[in-house]
Amino acid sequence: MTELPSQPAYYDDLGLSFEEAWNLVEAGSTDRNSPAHTPTVGTVDETGAPQLRIMILRDASRDTRTLRFHTDFRSIKAAQVRNNGVTSVLFYDMSAKLQIRMSGQTQLLPIGDVADAAWSNSTPFARRCYMAEAAPGLPIAGPSSGLPEWIQGKKPDEAQLADYRPNFATMLVEIQSVEWLYLANAGHRRACWQWQDAQKSWQGTWLVP
């Protein structure tokens, strides 16, 4: 009989599973090589249909229950968030065999301290994306980066970037639920946690995988 590998400490521990979920997600905001650095982010369009895309996780905090992403304020995605802030973020770590889904409400913040700090702390090349002359997703005649010809292949300076600051916005997702799935030959483990506003705490339960 083949002996199954030993399982991690969180395998049958609801509290440790919750901590590991946040450990993985928080690592994704600081480690560009982490699988959690580029999760799938889902919003809802005007027809109620889900719209998915890969985004870079810029910040994550279990203390404030927030995830932060950056977007173009003119984008379809931004319009969806303004119309309906319901958002779901999916992480998958193949090596750890972990899937984590975090869901909540998103605020679109084009101005304010959070957006200003995020803009200032981004590299010039990252901010160059917001110099596109038209809104992301609009049809164009041929293949193009959408950037003005004079900045193609060049690093913009602060003066050049300043005029395009209004195109930048942060997406701040306030997490209200966390779902966890760990895959194991010995038997999968699944759990979820809901934020309880009245108690200011998380309430978790095991689920059938």
Features from the language model and the residues they span:
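Binding-site signature for planar aromatic cofactors or substrates
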Residues: 1-209
